[in-house]
Amino acid sequence: MLDIKEIAKKARNAGYDYSILDTKSKNEALYAIADELDNNREAIFSVNKTDVENARNNGLNEALVDRLTLTDSRFREMVEGVRKVATLDDPVGRIYDGRTLPNGLTLVKKSVPFGVVGVIYESRPNVTVDIAALCLKSGNACFL
């Protein structure tokens, strides 16, 4: 099993690769993720059912169990959310401000990927997918 430092290093290395992906590749990957979620719906619901049972058996409070539970509508929203992210403008490389200095040097302020986005959360399978989609679109790796 990998330790947390090793996982973080792998995320950082992946961040380099994601930061140079072109918009078309990112959008194709997002649509492929949405399709794979749809194609694996039954398996995802089966695993989620096991997670919910384990949560209840371990005394997790009902509010967290509810957040953990995938419903048909939550699943549809999750898949459609990935497709929606694919339709958004690519934030990478967007120029927000710029000017030419007296010496002729052009100075611009533009958006670039962070590299790795770390997120701490619990009991929300849809958040996993949302974060992954947003990080992919913005050229970042994620560490969940």
Regions found by a protein language model. Give the residues of each.
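Conserved small-residue-rich beta-alpha loop and adjacent elements
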Residues: 87, 91-144
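N-terminal Rossmann-like NAD(P)+-binding subdomain of aldehyde/semialdehyde dehydrogenases
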Residues: 1-105, 134
